[in-house]
Every structure is written in C-alpha cells, then in structure tokens.
A protein has these predicted regions:
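Positively charged n-region of N-terminal signal peptides that target proteins for export
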Residues: 1-5
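Bacterial N-terminal signal peptides
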Residues: 7-17
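Cell-envelope and extracellular/periplasmic
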Residues: 24-35, 42, 50, 54-55, ...
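Conserved, well-structured core segments that form or line functional sites
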Residues: 137, 141-162, 166-168, 175, ...
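Short, electropositive alpha-helical surface patch
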Residues: 154, 161-162, 167-180, 209-218, ...
C-alpha cells in the first residue's frame, strides 16, 4: 500500500466528529475580536475553547476578521454553520464592530442602524449585484430564528469595548450596537450577554495602563493574546451566569478545577517534585494534601494555581485532597511509582484486544493476553483523540487499573513495556498514552519550537495556507455538515478543517500533550514514523525537535526518550540492497541515537509484509523496557542489538565493528545474511559475511576494491539475521553517503 494512501485511509478511520460522539457543539460566530489571524492579535473565541470540558462539548470557532452581521450572512458563512447545527447545539453570536459606516462602500459590509424591519436595496459597488440590506438587529434576529429552527440555542453577545477612555471611563456601546443587540435578543426571547458592559467594568477596575496591555500595541480594537485570554475568562464567567441556558454545563468548573489527568487510581512519579495544578476563584487559598504532606498557595488573578509536592517514595494507596474555603476534591487509590508518557501513531495506539474502538487492534493471542492482564500496580491514562489550534487545559481521559476489563483498551506496546518495568523494578507504574493513528511527528511539537527551526518553515507555511483557504471557503464547511447530516454508518466523512488533520503541525500537542504538562514523569516512549515517509529528509531534525521540546516542557534536559525503529513491511526484494522509503526512514530515526539519554528498539525481525501494524507488540514493548531498564534504572545487560560503529577496508574486504555486542555476534539461523557491498560505483551485490569475534568481515568475488557496505538496507530486509548474544537484532545501516 503506498504510504500516502495508507495515511489517508487511516485518517478517514480516525477523524472523529462531535456528531458521531453524541456531544453538543458550541459554534462561535463573529468578527476579528472573536477570531483573529493577524500576527500579534487574538480574539477571545480561540482561548474560550480551553474553558470547556472536551468530554462534554465540542467548540468550533467560525468567526472571521473583517465581517459584519451582514457579510457573514451574504458570504454563505452562516449557511455553512446551519449545515452543522443539530438539536442541543449552541451558537455564540457577536457582531457590531464592522456594521457601521456606508452601506455601499468598497467593502459593502455595513448594516442599517438600529433594530427595525426597514430595508434598503442597493447595487453593490464591489460586484454590481443587487442586495437588500437589513438593520443590524434584523440580521441578529435572523441568526436567532435560524438557530432555533434547528433545535439549537442562540446566545447574542454585545461587542467588546474599544480601548478608548474619557474622564476615567472606557467607552461603551449602550446606545448603539450594544443596545440593538440586546433588543434583538429580547424580541426573539434569546439569551443575551452584555459583554460590552461587563468588559468595560472589568477594564475600568484594571485601569488604563493595565488595560492597554490587553490590546495589540496601539490598536484600540483588537486584543493581544493576553487580552484574548482575559476576555475569554470573563466570557466563561458570563456564560455561568446565564439563566435558562445549559451551555454552562459544558464549562470546566469555575470554583475548584483540576485537569482530568488527576483522577482516582492515578500514579504519581516517585523521587521528584510532583506538580499539582488547576484553577480556583482568584485569590483563594488552595490546599493540597497527600501522604501526610500539605502545601498551600493562593490562586492567581486569572484563577490558576500550582503547587509542587515534595518528592515521595513509592508507596500507597493514598488519597489526594485539594480544597479551597468553599470547595474540595478528593482522589482515591493514588499510588506513587514510575510514570511514562507513551506516544506516537497507530502502532502505539494499537490496543491489546481486538476492539471496535480502534481500527487497528488485537495482538497475537489477544484473548489469553487480556484474560491474564491482572496487574493492580499497573495503571494507564488514555487521552482521547483531540486536535486543537491553540494549547488546551484539558483532554478527556481517566486512569484505569490494569485488569481484564480495562486492559482490553490499553495500548499494547505501552502495556507490555509497563508490565515489564513494574515487574523488574517492583514499584507501581503509570502509563500516559497520548497516541493518534496516522499522525505525523510535527503534530506533536509545539508551534514555538517548530518556528525556531528554519527547516520547518515549509511545513508551517503550508499549514497556514490550508487554514486560510479553509477559513475563506465556507462551502467546504457547509458540504462537510451536509455529509455528516446524511451519514448513518461506515466511514465518517472527512473533516476539511486542517486543524482537524493529524498530519498538520502542533495540533496534537495542543490537544493532547499541553493538557498533561507538567505532570511529573520519568520518561517517554515513542512509536511513530510511517506518516512521515514523505518528509524523511528532515525527520532527524523533527525527532530532535520533539525530544528537545518535551525536555523543555517538563524542565528535564535529560528526560529519557526511547523509540521504535520501523518494522519490516512490504514484499521482500531480490535486490541485495534495494533501499526504499522505509529503509531511509529507519536511517533518519537512528540519527537520534546521537542525542544523550535516548535509545532505539529495532524491529526489522517482527514485521508483517502485508500490514504496517504487526501484531507482535509484546516484543516491541519488551525491547523498549530493556532500553529503560538499562539506560534509566541502571540494570545490567545490553540495551539493544548491535549498532554500527565503524567500518574499515582491508584489501578486498570490509571489517565492521559494532556497539552493544554483549559477548559476541551470532547469526539467528543459518549463514549470516543481509550484507551487500560495492566499490565507488555503488553497484551493490550480495556479500559473503563472516563473524570474527565482535566484528563482521564482508567480501565478494565481484568487488575487488570494496568501498561501501550496507546491512538490511530494504523496506523488508527478509533474511537479515545478525544478532548479539541476547538474540537482539542488529540495526540496519549503510556507509555510502
């Protein structure tokens, strides 16, 4: 199967939608104060997403800069939203900044002043077409009626105030668009948030100097990222105050909240400070208690708080208690031991049991494996598939104890890895699985980290182009909504939103990694690469960036990072060293061995020529565990199979030396195979290979003056059988540039 086709196929399987998950959706529509793509500016709609619980509601921000209540309708953008609306959904509607001015100027976006039913017919200067222009209030009333006709709840929001002060007060719109928005909501019996008045009061309490810091430079209309965050927090509180509206049920708690990574049955990392964080009412005292320790802190102005519990020894079970004067949370059956992040694409997401929850699942002999999975000291947190444009506070998921019922849905690689660590080290083990089928590595890296590297500029520019194209094409969103409405079973219609595409930069970091940072952990294991075959040339830089990014996020420059080199795939070739995309990707992956505190599990011997998802996940997990036990826990033994160290030409042969020999080299079965040599013309032929102590000597009567050697240099290097004394396979390599 061609790699790109594989990626598209799996994306179709893995792309989730709010409709099929049965959750309500909040749609946000408005102008640039709600969503802004101008550098240095941000609208409140994007950070508002992080205030909602992703397990309860989906949030889609369809606001776009430069639009008014009139043009959002005439450009077909509202029709695109309507195509998605279903009973139980919500729509937040904020316009007004662009509704003033001349009706028929170069933008043709102004609406008639007021809330009346009067209209004016114009011939637009922009395209010569006739248009009947309504009042600002009439457009809002249409949005309200249309939303209600679909069973959704519309919420009208008055426009945010501009940063213009007079006599110590900030300007309001109580007799203009703010008033007309309120009147329209009242006429149609819709919910109304007087955001203009609420924010004006909050800005005045801050004063002109601090308020200026919430806006983008000298711009008095558009907020900075800090201002957008501030406004989003105010909006979340305003939503909580709505009467006869269930939208607040989808919000994260406003009094005392901790992210879902904190739940019953969690495992906390031993031997290092343990961060515990969340939100509470600004200024409130938050007290955290665990194992006889108590740490307190005051919530910041934005409600956020964090404490770092002193290092703990492995023990438990405990109860973690978090309280404020007005609220408390308690988490039971908390263990202290070793915590590992387990991430990557479908081979990491591949579950122990064959299950309908995953398209690729079920290890060899999975029924017996699941039945035997009784490991109460092993727990797993599985993050739900989530992609976002901006970093989130929460990802859906919960900790589960390893028993036959829960283990069926465990990542198989993570399970075998964790089981081996638990049995060898003898302490509780917690596994945090953040994996997404068909994902690229750049999807897991922070945007600021990617931006620092010029070699990733093309990836970021292309993603930016896709986002702009999708933003400017309401028909694509409308067509997707129509397809969802018709969908009953089978493959879910593909979401055209590039933010909901796991091939694009930073979207999985924002949705799945950001919410669990800075949960204390020992290290990370990684199984990914298939979806980056087309960018294998920059993969060494990408994997290095990922490692550096995670080490920076967790404040640990030596955070262990152990990863899987791609398994054998596709039909074996008769060519002695055919190469191929997968062979080159393995070379790209191996480059990370130069980074300290890393290790690579070689899997060329356990692949499946017909399936990129080999079912022998036990060997993969055990090899990763071996890397961790020797590299992180100091256990004796060799971490992996032989890894190329150097080669030297001696007459008509080449002598090859390896690291991680561990008492000698062996051939797994029969004569040593898999080597090819060539002179400077690089016409490789099969080589005769012989083990001499800890070295391999290769030659061929066809090559009198050998210059280069390759080993297992194929997508499926069938027959390559060099091992060390522990029967661990040697890593593929080539010496030709």
């Amino acid at each position: 199967m061609p790699p790109r086709f594989f990626a598209v196929l799996t994306a179709a399987f893995f792309t989730a939608c709010a409709c099929c998950l049965g959750k309500p959706t909040l749609f946000i529509i408005g102008d640039s104060t709600v969503r802004n793509s101008t550098p240095g500016q941000m609208g409140w709609g994007d950070p508002l997403v992080a205030h909602f619980d992703p397990s309860k509601i989906e949030v889609i921000n369809r606001a776009i800069g430069g639009r008014s209540s009139r043009t959002f309708l005439t450009e077909g953008r509202w029709d695109a939203v309507i195509a998605h609306l279903k009973p139980g959904d919500f729509v937040l509607i904020q316009f007004g900044h662009n509704d003033g001015g001349e009706l028929n100027d170069g933008r043709c976006r102004a609406s008639l002043r007021g809330n009346g039913d009067g209209t004016e017919i114009i011939t637009r200067k922009t395209d010569g077409k006739s248009e009947t222009v309504m009042s600002f209030g009439a457009y809002l009333r249409k949005y309200i009626r249309d939303a209600k006709s679909k069973g959704a709840t519309p919420i009208i929001v008055s426009l945010i105030p501009r940063n213009i002060w007079k006599d110590g007060r900030i300007g309001r719109s109580g007799d203009g668009h703010g008033l007309w928005a309120k009147q329209a909501a009242e006429q149609e019996n819709a919910c109304f948030i007087d955001f203009n008045q609420i924010l004006a009061g909050r800005y005045e309490s801050l004063g002109p100097e601090k308020t200026a810091g919430l806006f983008a430079g000298s711009d008095h209309t558009h907020t900075s990222a800090a201002g957008a965050e501030f406004n989003a927090g105010v909006m979340a509180n305003a939503i909580r105050g709505l009467k006869d509206c269930d939208l607040a049920k989808g919000l994260l708690p406003g009094d005392l909240w901790l992210p879902g990574i904190f739940s019953d049955h969690m495992v906390l990392q031993r031997g290092m400070p343990v961060p515990v964080w969340g939100t509470a009412t600004a200024g409130e005292r938050v007290t955290v208690k665990l194992a006889g320790q108590s740490v307190a802190v005051n919530a910041a102005e934005d409600g956020r708080w964090r404490v770092d519990l002193p290092p703990l020894a492995d023990a438990g079970p405990f109860t973690l208690e978090v309280s404020t004067p007005g609220a408390s949370r308690a988490f039971a059956d908390v263990l202290v031991g070793e915590v590992w992040l387990c991430s990557g694409q479908s081979n990491m997401d591949f579950t122990l049991a064959s299950t309908a929850k995953r398209s690729f699942s079920g290890v060899t002999d999975w029924k017996n494996e699941v039945a035997a999975a009784r490991q109460p000291m092993l727990r797993m947190f599985t993050a739900e598939w989530t992609m976002r444009e901006h970093p989130q506070r929460e990802v859906a998921g919960k900790w589960a104890v390893c028993d036959p019922e829960n283990a069926a849905d465990f990542s198989a690689v993570a399970y075998y890895f964790g089981r081996e660590i638990q049995q060898a080290v003898g302490v509780p083990v917690g596994l945090i699985t953040c994996a997404f089928g068909a994902s690229t590595i750049e999807a897991w890296i922070r945007e600021p980290t990617l931006t620092k590297h010029p070699q990733f500029e093309g990836l970021l520019k292309e993603f930016g182009r896709k986002r702009i194209a999708f933003r400017d094409d309401p028909q694509a969103f409308a067509s997707y909504g129509a397809a969802l409405a018709k969908w009953k079973s089978g493959r879910v219609p593909r979401n055209p939103d590039p933010v909901q595409d796991q091939h694009n930069p930073f979207v999985l970091h924002n949705g799945m990694i950001a919410p669990i940072v800075p949960y204390a952990l020992r290290g990370a294991i990684w199984y990914q690469g298939e979806s980056n075959l087309n960018t294998r040339g920059i993969y060494p830089d990408l994997q290095k960036a990922l490692i550096e990014d995670w080490r920076d996020l967790w404040g640990n420059p030596t955070l262990p990072f152990y990863y899987v080199q791609l398994a054998a795939y596709k039909a074996p070739s008769k060519d002695p060293a055919p190469g191929g995309q997968i062979a080159e990707m393995r070379e790209a992956q191996a480059a990370s061995l130069a980074i300290p505190h890393t290790g690579m599990a070689v899997t060329i011997d356990i692949g499946d020529e017909k399936d990129i998802h080999p079912r022998n996940k036990k060997a993969v997990g055990l090899r990763l565990a071996r890397l961790a036990l020797t590299g992180t826990y100091g256990r004796p033994g060799v971490p992996c199979g032989p890894v190329f160290q150097s080669a030297s030409v001696a007459g008509n042969s080449i002598r090859i030396r390896f690291d991680h020999v561990n008492g000698g080299l062996v051939s797994a079965a029969g004569p040593l195979c898999g080597f090819a040599i060539a002179d400077h013309d690089k016409r490789f032929v099969s080589a005769q290979a012989a083990i001499e102590g800890n070295e391999v000597v290769v030659s061929s009567p066809e090559v009198a003056a050998p210059a280069f050697v390759r080993y297992a240099w194929a997508d499926n290097p069938a027959g390559a059988n060099l091992r060390n004394a522990d029967c661990l396979p040697a890593a593929p390599f080539r010496t030709d540039p």
